[in-house]
């Protein structure tokens, strides 16, 4: 739900994002809505069909004047809705003239593709849907522009080495305006514990200590250890950890920082917290902090991952892109096109083509085939090795991965448009709600994450309205085997319960203020995001040894690479963006666009493979 933050070379910083000043209690960015997509579309919007009305849930929604709109279609009329900067009619390519084919246009896939294109590679991205972004995409309905996934955006700062989104955009000559969020998240927890994560670190520590004054020393020591890790990463130029020339170069430049990270690589946040903290309520709070990073508690969350989020929210801060999260993918897609590569939409890859054990191409559902020197899968590892490749030929390395990690649950998502006056003045943008019992933290529907992006950018909704995006963990098994009628009825029942909890805890009168509502289930995520069981990503079966067991980008299949949330370092927009940078660097070295040593490569990959067996 939340995101991790890593680094990209610092030389690309200048001019890549513009910060919009905060207002007072009103929405912090007001902009006249345009009838077309501004400069990110190739061609004139007046000559193109507008992408609007995208819907990835089926629900009975209240009309904006209180009436009822039935059966909002989940299927887009793709002939009318395809973005003009994408293509859908590229012929199959038998020659293998592409340097790389990327399956999927999620953020990880787009970053890998754009980084390769910048290095001079010819890249083709194949996207099943009609817009880019995957979980970081968007859809529009009745004047509302909804983020598909999380609205908590790291990586947009203008300082340090961990502003990966800023620099990924800059690499292809793109920039986005952003709005700083003064509060990362407002926790509403058992025993009336209310904690705001302020942008300023000292303000956050002061508030947390005021709730647990007897744990002041432990609080400072735990978060100081997080900063030790963060500062080590912030000093490094992170690229592919599978590329030895780069890796050894960084070690010789920054040996202390590299050794610090190596020390914490197999450790988890919960075990570190317990060195300094005894209060069970405070430890449970740290569990909640980690849960929004990894969907598991602190004892199962790698310390490096936790440190990135718990510190970068104060260092670089949370910054929301003007126009919504979908602007990130749109900008990267435009940048890819500007650099001579392309995205093919409505391109449903059904299999990876092997030739003597080497990945050489892909086949689409319509029969077209495309060939390239390398194949990069932005699908989950379960989809890649269970569907795009034959599961019975699962490599040993993937067997080991699936023994150590399971598919995390999916989510129930509720997108709503509400009357603005239901929200109190100075309402925070992001909320985490767990009312009564800490043991419900990881249970289905136990905790609720809420984003109200119109608190920051009012242009996302009609005047006088707000957007609420609610999500809570849910397993696909809860939604299988239902008739269409029972499926719709269950969505209404579950959504009603979730909304009632928010009405009781945060916003009295919420139900009566609803003007639009649409519900998505794990089946929705599976269908539109092409994710096995709609999963959020991998989570450890037991207590992991930090990040030691997470696979990198190379695979046991020659010519096949993976990128995204089932690769190191894991889930979250910045994490998958970093995965994309790592993947592009490794692929570029293998294609001859970067320096490479075959002898060192072989030795390092064997070492990394052995280390993963220790997890």
UniProtKB/Swiss-Prot annotation:
UniProt-listed SUPFAM superfamilies: FAD/NAD(P)-binding domain (SSF51905)
Matching InterPro entries: Amino_oxidase, CrtISO, CrtISO-like, FAD/NAD-bd_sf
Catalytic activity: 7,7',9,9'-tetra-cis-lycopene = all-trans-lycopene
Obligatory cofactor(s): NAD(+); NADP(+); FAD
Function description: Carotene cis-trans-isomerase that converts 7,9,9'-tri-cis-neurosporene to 9'-cis-neurosporene and 7,9,9',7'-tetra-cis-lycopene (also known as prolycopene) into all-trans-lycopene. Isomerization requires redox-active components, suggesting that isomerization is achieved by a reversible redox reaction acting at specific double bonds. Isomerizes adjacent cis-double bonds at C7 and C9 pairwise into the trans-configuration, but is incapable of isomerizing single cis-double bonds at C9 and C9'.
Domain of life, source organism: Eukaryota
Native source organism of the sequence: Solanum lycopersicum
An example Gene Ontology biological process: carotenoid biosynthetic process
Name of the molecule in the record: Prolycopene isomerase, chloroplastic
UniProt record similarity statement: Belongs to the carotenoid/retinoid oxidoreductase family. CrtISO subfamily.
A GO term for molecular function: carotenoid isomerase activity
Reported consequences of knocking out the gene: Plants display fruits with orange color due to an accumulation of prolycopene, explaining the tangerine mutant name.
EC number(s) reported in the record: 5.2.1.13
Membrane topology category: Peripheral membrane protein
Pathways per UniProt: Carotenoid biosynthesis; lycopene biosynthesis
Keyword Ribonucleoprotein: no
Keyword NAD tagged: yes
């Amino acid at each position: 739900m939340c995101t991790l933050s890593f680094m990209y070379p610092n030389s690309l910083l200048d001019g890549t994002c513009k910060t919009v000043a905060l207002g007072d209690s009103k929405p912090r960015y007001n902009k006249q809505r345009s009838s077309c997509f501004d400069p990110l579309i190739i061609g004139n919007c007046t000559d193109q069909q507008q992408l609007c009305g995208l819907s990835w849930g089926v629900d009975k929604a209240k009309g904006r004047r209180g009436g009822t709109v039935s059966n909002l279609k989940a299927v887009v009329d793709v002939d009318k809705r395809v973005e003009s900067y994408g293509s859908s009619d590229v012929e199959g390519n038998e020659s293998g003239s592409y340097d790389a084919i990327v399956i999927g246009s999620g953020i990880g896939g787009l970053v890998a593709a754009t980084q390769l294109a910048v290095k001079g590679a010819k890249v083709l991205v194949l996207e099943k849907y009609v817009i880019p972004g995957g979980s970081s995409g968007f859809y529009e309905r009745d004047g509302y522009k909804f983020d598909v996934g999380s609205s908590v955006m790291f990586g947009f700062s203008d300082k340090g080495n961990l502003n990966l989104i800023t620099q990924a955009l800059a690499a292809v000559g793109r920039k986005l305006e952003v709005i700083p969020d003064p509060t990362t998240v407002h926790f509403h927890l058992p025993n009336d514990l209310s904690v705001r994560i302020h942008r300023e670190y000292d303000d956050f520590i002061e508030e947390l200590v005021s709730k647990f004054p007897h744990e002041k020393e432990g609080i400072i020591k735990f978060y100081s250890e997080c900063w030790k890790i963060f500062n080590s990463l912030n000093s490094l130029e992170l690229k592919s950890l599978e590329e030895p020339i780069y890796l050894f170069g960084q070690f010789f430049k920054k040996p202390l920082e590299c050794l610090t990270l190596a020390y914490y690589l197999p450790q988890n946040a919960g075990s570190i917290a317990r060195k300094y903290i005894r209060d069970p309520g405070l430890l449970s709070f740290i569990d909640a902090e980690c849960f929004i990073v990894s969907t598991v508690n602190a004892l199962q969350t790698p310390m490096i991952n936790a440190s990135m989020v718990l510190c970068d929210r104060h260092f670089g801060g949370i910054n929301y892109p003007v126009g919504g999260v979908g602007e990130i993918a749109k900008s990267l897609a435009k940048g890819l096109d500007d650099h001579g590569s392309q995205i093919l939409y409505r391109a449903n890859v059904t299999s990876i083509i092997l030739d003597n054990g080497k990945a050489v191409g892909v086949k689409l559902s319509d029969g077209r085939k495309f060939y390239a020197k390398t194949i990069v899968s932005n699908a989950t590892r379960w989809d890649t090795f269970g569907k795009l490749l034959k599961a019975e030929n699962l490599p040993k390395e993937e067997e080991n991965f699936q023994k150590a990690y399971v598919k995390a649950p999916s989510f129930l998502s509720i997108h709503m448009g509400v009357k603005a006056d239901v929200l109190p003045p100075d309402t925070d943008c992001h909320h985490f709600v767990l009312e009564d019992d800490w043991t419900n933290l990881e249970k289905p529907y136990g905790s609720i994450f809420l984003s109200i992006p119109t608190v920051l950018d009012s242009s996302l909704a009609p005047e006088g309205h707000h957007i609420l995006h609610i999500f809570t963990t849910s397993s696909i098994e809860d939604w299988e085997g239902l008739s269409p009628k029972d499926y719709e009825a269950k969505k209404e029942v579950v959504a009603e319960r979730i909304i009632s909890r928010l009405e009781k805890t945060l916003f009295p009168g919420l139900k009566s203020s609803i003007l639009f509502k649409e519900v998505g289930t794990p089946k929705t995520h599976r269908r539109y995001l092409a994710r096995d069981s709609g999963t959020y990503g991998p989570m450890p079966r037991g207590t992991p040894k930090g990040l030691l067991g997470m696979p990198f980008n190379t695979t046991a299949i020659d010519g096949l690479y993976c990128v995204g949330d089932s690769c190191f370092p894991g889930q979250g927009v910045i994490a998958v963006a970093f995965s994309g940078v790592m993947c592009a660097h490794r692929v570029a070295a293998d294609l001859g666009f970067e320096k490479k040593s075959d002898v060192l490569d072989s030795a390092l990959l064997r070492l990394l493979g052995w280390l993963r067996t220790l997890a």
